[in-house]
């Protein structure tokens, strides 16, 4: 019997969710960066810079960028780790990963790339100093399993950074809902010729755990000293936890 889960507001089988999420990112990959700039009015660049700073990445670190897609975080981590570091770009979606890899090569930078499932990471225990997942955990079916895998591959003293859409400050909720369910699909239709994927984005944000719930999930996976930072009134939250 196949277990059920949610794809946005719709209940589907786990197999169907994996297929539908893959279809979303195959569809939006080509215009992904442009849509990020439009949807966030460029704020996503500041959120990602903040994530890098909070990660504590330093020269020589081994870093795993999960759901790294178009390599925004990978590029920023390289600035911190330098020539003695090792930054892996990974994603479950080949369309996204190909764009990220090509962007790196166009910049004259080569990093190891792997297409893999965050719930079954192909890396040894205690290997990475930093693990980061930005705007990817929301789409994972078994978030608890993925977080346990992130804990497994971190070396003692290492940190996990989770950057993700979260629960907005309540007084802003009506305005945010209007923007999410009206403006985002409209922009998706005009720019990416795909309103359905951006409707899923709005729905998936509502189904994602709250700031406190995600903190608890990270603690249950083994992370310690877990804390979070609300960015842009909680539109996005950055969680950080350590492995000791």
From Swiss-Prot:
Positions annotated to bind S-adenosyl-L-methionine: 70, 91, 117-118
Pathway: Quinol/quinone metabolism; menaquinone biosynthesis; menaquinol from 1,4-dihydroxy-2-naphthoate: step 2/2; Cofactor biosynthesis; ubiquinone biosynthesis
EC number(s) on file: 2.1.1.163, 2.1.1.201
Keywords: Menaquinone biosynthesis, Methyltransferase, S-adenosyl-L-methionine, Transferase, Ubiquinone biosynthesis
Pfam (any one): Ubie_methyltran
Enzyme class per UniProt: transferase
Gene3D superfamilies hit by this protein: Vaccinia Virus protein VP39 (3.40.50.150)
Role this protein plays: Methyltransferase required for the conversion of demethylmenaquinol (DMKH2) to menaquinol (MKH2) and the conversion of 2-polyprenyl-6-methoxy-1,4-benzoquinol (DDMQH2) to 2-polyprenyl-3-methyl-6-methoxy-1,4-benzoquinol (DMQH2).
Family of this protein: Belongs to the class I-like SAM-binding methyltransferase superfamily. MenG/UbiE family.
NCBIfam families for the chain: MenG_MenH_UbiE (TIGR01934), PRK00216.1-1 (NF001240)
Protein name stated in the entry: Ubiquinone/menaquinone biosynthesis C-methyltransferase UbiE
